[in-house]
Amino acid sequence: MLLTVDVRNTNIVLGLFTGSGEHSKLVQDWRMRTDARMTADELALIFRGLLGAHTDQITGVSALSTVPSVLREIRVMLTRYWGHVPHVLVEPGVRTGVPLLVDNPKEVGADRIVNSLAAHHLYDAPCIVVDFGTSTCVDVVSAKGEFLGGAIAPGLEISSDALASQSAALRKVELVRPRSVVGKNTVECMQSGAVFGFAGLVDGLVRRVRKELPAFSGSDVVVIATGDRAPLIMPETETVDEHEPDLTLEGLRLVYERNQARRGARRSPLE
């Protein structure tokens, strides 16, 4: 079984895959809050508790972290507790098969890279990936699977929390779809601005990408939503085509299998 670990600023998601290649299947996933202070031992304790009987069935691990302190602890955890298991940490220098056609490839987040890889693998077409996480990332992937760049905006929670904390008369509200775009009270007005406002932000960015890049003006372009808040925002958009909740986990699986295949190819002449 392959364990995939997706560490973001807000949540950590674990995914467990059986099989490989076309026969791979995500059989279970877990979600927990990210704590940048967690140690390798604490991470191992939590992971083992969630995995239960599957702990001893892990044959590989593929992980990414957008939180540097947690990435360091995951590296220690893998060495200490799963040292006998092949693992891949997606970071600069790791081969993903995604050409990064940007000014500074080392600045591109691992989450954006694996999302691009998974999108190209699933659809084999020009793709625009919208990841609704701590930040809202719009990533542009060519028909060849190249990462062309994109846009980063504040996430839904960050924007809502900032509005409440910086405004004396406003308070934090539950982020749900209001009954109308025209709010009848302060709570509904804030919910309308958040939900419909972010839907408009996404639609605006997607339309600008399609207008600016000739290769993205056709009907073959696929716009994919992923991330924690995708189920809330996607239904209000006009440009998003598909929802792939496990896109990052799928990308981590693909990176692991590509690196394992490469290692096998390097070993084969000596066998």
Curated annotation (Swiss-Prot):
Name of the featured protein: Type III pantothenate kinase
Xref: Gene3D superfamilies: 3.30.420.40
EC number of the protein: 2.7.1.33
NCBIfam families (alphabetical): baf, PRK13318.1-3, PRK13321.1
Quaternary assembly: Homodimer.
Residues annotated to bind K(+): 131
Keyword 4Fe-4S on entry: no
GO terms for MF: ATP binding; metal ion binding; pantothenate kinase activity
Biochemical pathway: Cofactor biosynthesis; coenzyme A biosynthesis; CoA from (R)-pantothenate: step 1/5
Pfam families assigned to the protein according to its UniProt record, in alphabetical order: Pan_kinase
Organism: Rhodococcus jostii (strain RHA1)
Role according to the record: Catalyzes the phosphorylation of pantothenate (Pan), the first step in CoA biosynthesis.
Cofactor(s) this protein requires: NH4(+); K(+)
Highest rank taxon of the organism: Bacteria
Residues that, per the record, bind substrate: 109-112, 186
CC annotations in GO: cytoplasm
